[in-house]
Amino acid sequence: MRYQNMFETLKKHEKMAFIPFVTLGDPNYELSFEIIKTLIISGVSALELGLAFSDPVADGITIQASHLRALKHASMAKNFQLLKKIRDYNHNIPIGLLAYANLIFSYGVDGFYAQAKECGIDSVLIADMPLIEKELVIKSAQKHQIKQIFIASPNASSKDLEQVATHSQGYIYALARSGVTGASRILENDSSAIIKTLKAFSPTPALLGFGISKKEHITNAKGMGADGVICGSALVKIIEENLNNENAMLEKIKGFIGGMIF
């Protein structure tokens, strides 16, 4: 219900969803919590939180580095502790997890989704799991009332997009370009065709991710028919560049979010 409520409220005010991505536990668990509180206070629509992994193949160098920083002290037990703390801090904001398949399968699929539910998580996106393998997780997701999100890539066939649109819950993650994550100067591709195709198959909101780093990118995404954007690398870069100055980091994050939301 949290995603539904969020999108209904945004639609009423003719606003785009702005969802930031950060890696949980980067650069440490204490500061990670302060970063996430700052994001919430700054007015983001929802949270997308990555679970640190040793081989984040879908990510570019900025987010890879955040995984490495978090891995110095990360554990699944600590991840779930922090997630509970975040949910206790704010009961209404939608919280999504972005994880790599190996983390979930080594933990145990049903146990992972059960813990996610316990922590008040709303959705899970598995970065490196193709749609064809959805049956491996979908029963556990449904059992524990977690929305399973799938990725729509620019080179996907119409048939694949139909599957993504049909099976994604909460929202659909539409990639603005192929390749790995990373901030872009310009949005390289016109994603209006892929978004139009997704919307023909399902009313589930489509969010554009990969390369979102400027306000104009959000304006462009809106023009393409997207319901919102996911922004990761540009935000994680602020964390990376201010590791030695916590106050400056949080102020710059606040300023960045303030400049992106409209």
From Swiss-Prot:
Catalytic residues, chain numbering: E48 (proton acceptor), D59 (proton acceptor)
Xref: PROSITE patterns: TRP_SYNTHASE_ALPHA
Keyword annotations of the record: Amino-acid biosynthesis, Aromatic amino acid biosynthesis, Lyase, Tryptophan biosynthesis
Record-linked CDD domains: Tryptophan_synthase_alpha
GO BP annotations listed: L-tryptophan biosynthetic process
EC number, UniProt record: 4.2.1.20
Superkingdom: Bacteria
Cited InterPro entries: Aldolase_TIM, RibuloseP-bd_barrel, Trp_synthase_alpha_AS, Trp_synthase_suA
Pfam families to which the protein is assigned, alphabetical: Trp_syntA
Pathway stated in the Swiss-Prot or TrEMBL entry: Amino-acid biosynthesis; L-tryptophan biosynthesis; L-tryptophan from chorismate: step 5/5
Reaction equations catalysed: (1S,2R)-1-C-(indol-3-yl)glycerol 3-phosphate + L-serine = D-glyceraldehyde 3-phosphate + L-tryptophan + H2O
Family annotation (SUPFAM superfamilies): Ribulose-phoshate binding barrel
Function description: The alpha subunit is responsible for the aldol cleavage of indoleglycerol phosphate to indole and glyceraldehyde 3-phosphate.
Assigned protein family: Belongs to the TrpA family.
Protein name: Tryptophan synthase alpha chain
Organism whose genome encodes this protein: Helicobacter pylori (strain ATCC 700392 / 26695) (Campylobacter pylori)
High-level lineage: Bacteria, Pseudomonadati, Campylobacterota, Epsilonproteobacteria, Campylobacterales
